[in-house]
């Protein structure tokens, strides 16, 4: 289901209508709160427990309900929306919807995204009655869903009493924003339309007090870091993914400009700092880094990591050649210098901003980079009619994103991770992928949500195996009038799994992907789909997608050989496989 005719883009800004005391309802209050924190679209799947609530969401002038094909994609869409807008929301029904969306909530939790998951719950009169209800697992205890959500959300509100509903809703939404994590709000199905005095006044807009640094701790951290960096001959800066949650991207850029240090980004921080910075040297990803980047980072005698996440994927099976005693690690609220000391209650944005004012300029690492850097060789080309290679595909994607029409690139879990990392992003072009959680199929729903939150076109690179998990919501993209460009890389299987551990389970049934998208299109909305097998066909397809079909959702199936993978995936897969295969420690 979809309100406002299902048109594309976010609804126009509308004044929040203040209800009279006679129609001030829980549903209306929740809807207004969502608008106040920046949500214009709620991704939903209807069910009998949430229908009345959805009516109230639709009635809110500043809010659109976007109906999705399944709850998992609704959650992924809210994830993508939160990446672009700063907060996202989804609405599903009790248990059958809640447990389906749970995987997406786990991904949002791992990526530090404020996501408001709203569940229509049982009638308030049924709690504690020992009754058996549908959409449950057949027990009179209705808390199973709540218990599943508890580890994956930072706050849980079960609203089955109007007296504290106002407080629970406000507390849940504010906690999501403050903690930058998902929250769970369950609303009994009989409550959204009931007036209550606590909702009768105009809700005061949220003002969340910013977290402040302890000034003594901040200055001590600065002094220790400056002394540490001043002793170094060739220090470097490395951006990490927690720059987003700390809202410290601008402060990091200021530090990069002031320090003169060479600047790299961890793979999951791509897009969080401009790649047009004068001393940007690429992606630091251990053995699969951008050419010459790892050599500079790992040979540095000091490195400042801002918001890093070191896991088995980002460290290439724990094989990065980094030393703790050389590192300053800046987390959203904490700074650790070498093996110690550590300083708590230090906000990353404050720390980086103040450090930029006092740091001594040192360009040695970047000077070394310029000395060893060898420009990339001749761009790959295919002979006329030759089977298309993936590196040739990404040569053309690089050219395509160079203009101003592309707002972001999204990479699905798989070889697209590695190929998209090599794209040089122009100023203002975002980049998103789900590295910490790595759930295949994420990008379809996330593309839906991200594209709904921005005006520019979004490019997505998706493998065939991942696409088969969540393909249905291409339908919702069409209903919303989105204009994204999807490159479906058809190489016959789960390529990333093949390079970690091969087996017959990594081979999938081939689909007629173009036929599938045309069937979903069914003559409604603007859609164009094609299949390409050689470079000439690819060039023609991109020309059409960016020309005559620029106002359409464009789907380009790229047929590739099953063994056509990036060298980075081959290296990364072997190292992750080795990490996974470590024998048990002796007892």
Swiss-Prot record:
UniProt KW Lyase keyword: yes
Binding site for substrate: 48, 135, 497
Sites where the protein binds Mg(2+): 464, 491, 493
Cofactor requirements of the protein: a metal cation; thiamine diphosphate
Single GO MF annotation: magnesium ion binding
Reaction catalyzed: a 2-oxocarboxylate + H(+) = an aldehyde + CO2
Pfam families on file: TPP_enzyme_C (PF02775), TPP_enzyme_M (PF00205), TPP_enzyme_N (PF02776)
GO CC field: cytosol
Endpoints of the signal sequence: none
GO biological process: aromatic amino acid family catabolic process to alcohol via Ehrlich pathway
EC number: 4.1.1.1
Residue ranges of the region described as Thiamine pyrophosphate binding: 415-496
Cofactor mode of binding and number, as noted: Binds 1 metal ion per subunit. Binds 1 thiamine pyrophosphate per subunit.
Intrachain disulfide bonds: none
UniProt entry keywords in alphabetical sequence: Decarboxylase, Lyase, Magnesium, Metal-binding, Thiamine pyrophosphate
Protein family according to the UniProt entry: Belongs to the TPP enzyme family.
Subunit structure comment from the entry: Homotetramer.
Protein's UniProt name: Pyruvate decarboxylase 3
Organism of provenance: Oryza sativa subsp. japonica
